[in-house]
Amino acid sequence: MLGILVVLCLIPAADVTENKILVAQRPLLIVANRTATLVCNYTYNGTGKEFRASLHKGTDSAVEVCFISWNMTKINSNSNKEFNCRGIHDKDKVIFNLWNMSASQTDIYFCKIEAMYPPPYVYNEKSNGTVIHVRETPIQTQEPESATSYWVMVAVTGLLGFYSMLITAVFIIYRQKSKRNRYRQSDYMNMTPRHPPHQKNKGYPSYAPTRDYTAYRSWQP
């Protein structure tokens, strides 16, 4: 009778030990490039064939970031709309890949592993979690470059505008001087010679020379 009681007491204890899930996480993960890889190592010696692993954010695990479920034939994964997360199952570990993270998502994250089927339903006790610290991407180095390039463009544009105005003004002045010189030359060309008022017009054109008849008279007999 005593032997039967000992056997009955040992069987439940063995079941509890066999179906227990233990999870191990690294305590700190620093993210500098907005991409994080969180590995959840677990041990399970039960007979479950369908599992679910999920990643939770916050000390109270209130936010489920993403999850992955798998069995012998298929794998299913889903992510919260506020996160970019994907889960991968690999033997005795689940890998959660997160990308495009922001500094506001810095928090403590917990892995939860569940044996869904067949019964009994088992899940791990809450682990110590992993603090994911997301560093803000520095953008101050880009501002001076953009400002400098902007002012360089403004200076070049202003200089080109000044030179174009200067060239236009020189061209206008040169054109006005050329017109004045043409007017003066046309006035000189239109002037005709005139006889003094005391000379009489002998019927010859103004350009014809006058003949001297005294030379002819000296030859008369």
Swiss-Prot record:
GO terms for cellular component: external side of plasma membrane; plasma membrane. Residues 188-209 are annotated as: Disordered. It is a single-pass type I membrane protein. The chain crosses the membrane at residues 150-174. Disulfide bonds join C40-C111, C66-C85. Residues 175-221 are cytoplasmic. Keywords: Disulfide bond, Glycoprotein, Immunoglobulin domain, Membrane, Receptor, Signal, Transmembrane, Transmembrane helix. Residues 14-149 are extracellular. It is found in: Membrane. Possibly involved in T-cell activation. This is T-cell-specific surface glycoprotein CD28 homolog.
